[in-house]
Amino acid sequence: MSEATAATAAIGKCWSVYLVRAENGALYCGISDDPLRRFDTHCSGKGARFFHSSPARALVYVEACASKGDALRRERAIKALSKRAKERLLVGVPVLREVGEPAI
């Protein structure tokens, strides 16, 4: 095991809460230890059923959390917000990745 891998294992996974914009403009909120990979999964049609009616189009927000529990609590708080309040979270935040863009 490399030093970097050992350090990551000692610290634990970094969890994030993320928002994905669907083709119809709706926002989907979820958590993941790898939001870019999860976005790619949503785009491939193998992610949440939410995207069956309107495909994922852009990863628009990612917020790092200290633990999985913190990410779950933040996800619940964001899901409780109105659409308008969720849109306010995105003001000034650049789109992180759109469908078809290569992984960095």
UniProtKB/Swiss-Prot annotation:
UniProt-recorded name of the protein: UPF0213 protein PA3854
Signal sequence extent: none
Protein family according to the UniProt entry: Belongs to the UPF0213 family.
Disulfide pattern: none
Annotated Pfam families: GIY-YIG (PF01541)
Residue ranges constituting the GIY-YIG domain according to the UniProt record: 13-88
